A protein has these predicted regions:
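Long, charge-rich, low-complexity alpha-helical segments
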Residues: 28-73
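A short, structured beta-strand/loop element
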Residues: 2-45
Length: 73
Protein backbone atom coordinates (compact mmCIF):
# COMPACT_ATOMS: atom_id res chain seq x y z
CA UNK A 1 0.00 0.00 0.00
CA UNK A 2 1.31 3.42 -0.90
CA UNK A 3 1.42 5.99 1.90
CA UNK A 4 0.22 9.00 -0.12
CA UNK A 5 0.01 11.45 2.82
CA UNK A 6 3.81 11.58 2.91
CA UNK A 7 4.09 12.56 -0.78
CA UNK A 8 4.30 16.37 -1.16
CA UNK A 9 3.06 16.25 -4.77
CA UNK A 10 -0.44 15.04 -3.87
CA UNK A 11 -3.37 16.05 -1.71
CA UNK A 12 -6.82 14.82 -0.79
CA UNK A 13 -9.91 16.80 0.10
CA UNK A 14 -13.22 15.12 0.97
CA UNK A 15 -15.02 17.98 -0.78
CA UNK A 16 -13.28 17.41 -4.14
CA UNK A 17 -12.99 14.52 -6.58
CA UNK A 18 -14.73 12.06 -4.24
CA UNK A 19 -11.88 12.31 -1.72
CA UNK A 20 -9.45 10.76 -4.21
CA UNK A 21 -5.73 11.52 -4.07
CA UNK A 22 -5.04 14.19 -6.68
CA UNK A 23 -2.00 16.08 -7.89
CA UNK A 24 -1.61 19.08 -5.57
CA UNK A 25 -3.41 22.16 -6.87
CA UNK A 26 -5.41 20.19 -9.46
CA UNK A 27 -8.43 17.94 -9.76
CA UNK A 28 -6.40 15.29 -11.61
CA UNK A 29 -6.49 11.96 -9.76
CA UNK A 30 -3.14 10.27 -9.15
CA UNK A 31 -4.77 7.08 -10.42
CA UNK A 32 -5.09 8.74 -13.85
CA UNK A 33 -1.30 8.76 -14.14
CA UNK A 34 -1.01 5.03 -13.53
CA UNK A 35 -3.97 4.24 -15.80
CA UNK A 36 -2.45 6.26 -18.65
CA UNK A 37 1.00 4.72 -18.17
CA UNK A 38 -0.57 1.26 -18.14
CA UNK A 39 -2.26 2.10 -21.44
CA UNK A 40 1.12 2.98 -22.95
CA UNK A 41 1.19 6.75 -22.57
CA UNK A 42 4.47 8.54 -21.98
CA UNK A 43 4.98 10.85 -19.02
CA UNK A 44 5.44 13.74 -21.46
CA UNK A 45 2.06 12.94 -23.01
CA UNK A 46 0.36 12.80 -19.62
CA UNK A 47 1.71 16.23 -18.67
CA UNK A 48 0.55 17.58 -22.04
CA UNK A 49 -2.94 16.10 -21.62
CA UNK A 50 -3.28 17.40 -18.05
CA UNK A 51 -1.78 20.93 -18.14
CA UNK A 52 -2.19 21.55 -14.40
CA UNK A 53 0.17 18.67 -13.59
CA UNK A 54 3.90 19.36 -13.73
CA UNK A 55 6.66 16.97 -14.71
CA UNK A 56 8.12 17.49 -11.22
CA UNK A 57 4.87 16.32 -9.64
CA UNK A 58 4.79 13.23 -11.85
CA UNK A 59 8.39 12.42 -10.99
CA UNK A 60 7.67 12.87 -7.28
CA UNK A 61 4.63 10.57 -7.47
CA UNK A 62 6.51 7.88 -9.40
CA UNK A 63 9.48 8.11 -7.04
CA UNK A 64 7.21 7.93 -4.00
CA UNK A 65 5.34 4.93 -5.42
CA UNK A 66 8.59 3.13 -6.25
CA UNK A 67 10.00 3.75 -2.77
CA UNK A 68 6.76 2.47 -1.21
CA UNK A 69 6.80 -0.69 -3.29
CA UNK A 70 10.49 -1.36 -2.66
CA UNK A 71 10.40 -0.59 1.07
CA UNK A 72 10.90 -3.57 3.36
CA UNK A 73 7.72 -4.81 4.98
Amino acid sequence: MIDWPTCPAVERDPERVSDAWVFRGTRVPVAALFENLEDGALVSQFVEWFPGVTIEQVRAVLDHAARSVLAPA
